[in-house]
Amino acid sequence: MRLTIDHHTRYQFSEPQARVVQLLRMTPADHVGQTVSDWRIDVDCDARLRDGRDGYGNLTTMLYIDGPISAMELMVRGEVLTDDSAGVVRGCTETLPPLFFTRVTAQTQADEAIMALAETVVGSGTHSADRAVALMAAVHDVITPRPGRTEKTITAADAFALGHGSVRDCAHVLIAAARAVGYPARLVSGHCLDGPNAASHSSAHCWTELYIEGEGWISLDPSTNRRPRDSYVRVAIGLDASDSTPLSGTRRGGGIEALDVDVRVALIQTQG
């Protein structure tokens, strides 16, 4: 597929800010099944941008704005060519061993209910892609994805108890369940042409990768109950969403910050 992505973020501050610093994880990298043909980041005010990589190997951009500033708009646009890799992850920059991704975070702590689900599905058998897919399906059956962007951060255990959550919450539940039975697991942020948030244009997408010994990393999307294919664009990874969120940062100044996000993914039709 040839996909275009437009990710606009608008900040409005109730009081002028003396300085704004943002860490952007919004630039996808090339790997098997994904080629970035065009990508750019624009800001509607004077700003300094510095590209780099974080500890996970994600492409990053540091954004620095000196005030006073009362509003700003960040525009990320690009075009990505994707091929169907059947949910198998290859050719990515890997800076950390799979064992690192067995670490439990506050967002991905499994409670007794999540552990019981994982043990019922996976049991004590050898880890395999089939068991990982079965675990994804089990998580999909017990937590309903709610489209849209959410400001409230809840844990995997809370989302599991509620029985619904954002695509981020669905991913956190699968990560918690997978780690509970020994799978290295990580969260992926990116974009999806036909995901739960496609109609609302309100946020990017999240899914999960699990490591299978002898096979490598495989992609699983518990919000759609499928293995990501060529309608997905992979951008960043982390232990949980806090490590791979598209935007994070600080500001120097008082008042309230209002954020408006519009994300659109489109398929470029080709003649042939």
Put a short name on every predicted segment.
Residues 1-119, 182:
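Linear, non-domain "peripheral" regions
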Residues 1-4, 32-41, 146-148, 166-172, ...:
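A broad, low-specificity signal for short, low-complexity segments enriched in glycine/proline
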Residues 3, 23-26, 136-142, 171:
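Short acidic/polar alpha-helix capping motifs at helix-coil junctions
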Residues 23-25, 40, 75, 207, ...:
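Generic structural signal for residues positioned in beta-strands
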Residues 30-37, 50-51, 65-68, 99-103, ...:
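Glycine-rich loops and low-complexity Gly/Arg-rich segments
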Residues 68, 163-166, 200:
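Secondary-structure capping and boundary motifs in well-ordered enzyme cores
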Residues 80-84, 90, 95-165, 173, ...:
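Secondary-structure boundary elements
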Residues 137, 169-251, 255:
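Hydrophobic/aromatic-rich core segments of domains that either
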